[in-house]
């Protein structure tokens, strides 16, 4: 028991920690623990790092291969464009040799066809305008007819009472009977 008491008493004599911080003294930080941690990181990290580098290498090689293919396609298109340019230049030389009469003829044909197209468009426009005007007129007529019909029905409903209504029905039935006798 005396040893336990002595140990608690000795705790009171320990100097208190002055501050909390990082120990930058390599010799005071356990070099064995650091070497074990570094060894584990190198051992297990080597495979992951080599896989990452291999993947990156493959992507770079694919990118280079794609660039080479695109370069080849661009060179091929450039050659085709140059061939077309040579062909167009030869045709231009032929036009110059033959003179500008062909160009003038084409110009007149283009002007004539354009004027015909404009004329047709004008005719289509006029037909469309006439159609829309007729459509608007028909709509107005229909609305006027509907309003007149509603007005007439309103007038009839306000003027008709039951007795007048029965007399009108009787007169119409009588006219219908007379028409039926005439047709027989």
UniProtKB/Swiss-Prot annotation:
The chain crosses the membrane at residues 27-49. It is a single-pass membrane protein. It is found in: Plastid, Chloroplast thylakoid membrane. InterPro entries: ATP_synth_b/b'su_bac/chlpt. GO terms for cellular component: chloroplast thylakoid membrane; proton-transporting ATP synthase complex. Keywords: ATP synthesis, CF(0), Chloroplast, Hydrogen ion transport, Ion transport, Membrane, Plastid, Thylakoid, Transmembrane, Transmembrane helix, Transport. The keyword Signal does not apply. GO terms for molecular function: proton-transporting ATP synthase activity, rotational mechanism. Coiled coil: none annotated. The keyword Thylakoid applies. CDD domains: ATP-synt_Fo_b. It comes from the Eukaryota. F(1)F(0) ATP synthase produces ATP from ADP in the presence of a proton or sodium gradient. F-type ATPases consist of two structural domains, F(1) containing the extramembraneous catalytic core and F(0) containing the membrane proton channel, linked together by a central stalk and a peripheral stalk. During catalysis, ATP synthesis in the catalytic domain of F(1) is coupled via a rotary mechanism of the central stalk subunits to proton translocation. F-type ATPases have 2 components, F(1) - the catalytic core - and F(0) - the membrane proton channel. F(1) has five subunits: alpha(3), beta(3), gamma(1), delta(1), epsilon(1). F(0) has four main subunits: a(1), b(1), b'(1) and c(10-14). The alpha and beta chains form an alternating ring which encloses part of the gamma chain. F(1) is attached to F(0) by a central stalk formed by the gamma and epsilon chains, while a peripheral stalk is formed by the delta, b and b' chains. Belongs to the ATPase B chain family. In plastids the F-type ATPase is also known as CF(1)CF(0). PANTHER family: ATP SYNTHASE SUBUNIT B, CHLOROPLASTIC. This is ATP synthase subunit b, chloroplastic. It comes from Cucumis sativus. The lineage of its organism: Eukaryota, Viridiplantae, Streptophyta, Embryophyta, Tracheophyta.
